Amino acid sequence: MDITGDSQYQCWNLTEKDAEKVRELLSHAQKYEAIEMRDAIAAGLTGWWYGAYLMSEEKFMAVAYITQSFVYLFGRDKTAMRCIGRNLGRNSPKRSGTASHSIFGPDALVKAFWDGFEVAGKDVKSDTLLNLCELTEILCKQNDAYAVRVAEKKDFALVFEFLGEALIDELGMDVRRLGREGHEKYCSEQIANGRILVGTHRGKPAFVGEFRETPQGIFLEHAHFPIAMRRPKVMRGIHARVAELLLGRAPTLLFYVDAANEDLKAAVDEVGYHVVMPGRLMRLR
């Protein structure tokens, strides 16, 4: 157990005995806050969780959920989150080879975490405002030039390439070369599970994306367009077809959009997406 410089908090790696108090903290999240964390804890406090405990009130004020490539943040107090960042930064390796982590959560909490975490050898690769957008109704007309369907075995090569490109920023490496066997297995499993979509523009490959179902709706993830297809008109046409397919499975479609990507914002706005939760994504190297 680490006791921070601020004596009102204690920080430690969480175990199952802490689960109920973590759930109590997460119960204060708004509808679209801490979705990944709430989904993860539904089956128990597995994986790596780290928390800041306010001793005077006997409750957690901030928690971090750490996966292979992400650090998800939620809390009710910036000081508590700064303490988490300080302790994790103190114990973090100065260099981590080719691997990278992405810190994600509400803007103020990511800032507080980084204020505590920042250590020599940890650099910010990118710092992005990432908006969670919701779609419940398609507002634009469909165009027959675009088509989207669930990927099949015959699409493996396309999925392998496009999904590999989509994962470069998240993982900090090109899994098509540095983790080829694992990436092949992942693509095959996701295709078999019916969780990959492929899209075309006039018959030419234009899009690959993944989706997963959550209590809040269907999440569209790792949505990738090759450079030649990153035009607002094309992205609008593909996203409209994606929505047509997925809204047949659930009433709500969710998608994270880079607030600085004007072309993508314009495309999804026309389809009918609107911002429901702003967030911040900081990628480290």
What spans do the regions from the language model cover?
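Acyl-donor-binding surface of acyltransferase catalytic domains
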Residues: 60, 67-146, 255, 279-285
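Short alpha-helical
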Residues: 17, 79, 108, 262-263
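Conserved donor-binding loop and adjoining core beta-sheet/short helix segment
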Residues: 7-10, 14, 30, 37-96, ...
